[in-house]
Amino acid sequence: MITEDFYKKRMLQYYTDEEAFRIVYSFLEDKAKEAKSQGDKKKEQAYLEVRILFLKRNIKIRKEMDQLKAQYEYQKKRE
């Protein structure tokens, strides 16, 4: 059973993670552009690869968040 307190704390954590993701993703994008303008292909590739890893992590977090939200809403309907 998902308590309302747990649900609220977990959703807050998801939203905090989402905000952190946006900051890091933007930073990595800027660094990749900077490396490209300097002609450093290896650095650009490294920044892009890390950015992709963060994107995959964010997708996983969003799926977990959606699943928790669906479970909580279903539980509320049954009560």
Describe each model-derived feature in a short phrase:
Residues 2-34, 71:
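N-terminal acidic leader/helix
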Residues 26-74:
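Short, charge-rich amphipathic interface segments used for partner binding and complex assembly
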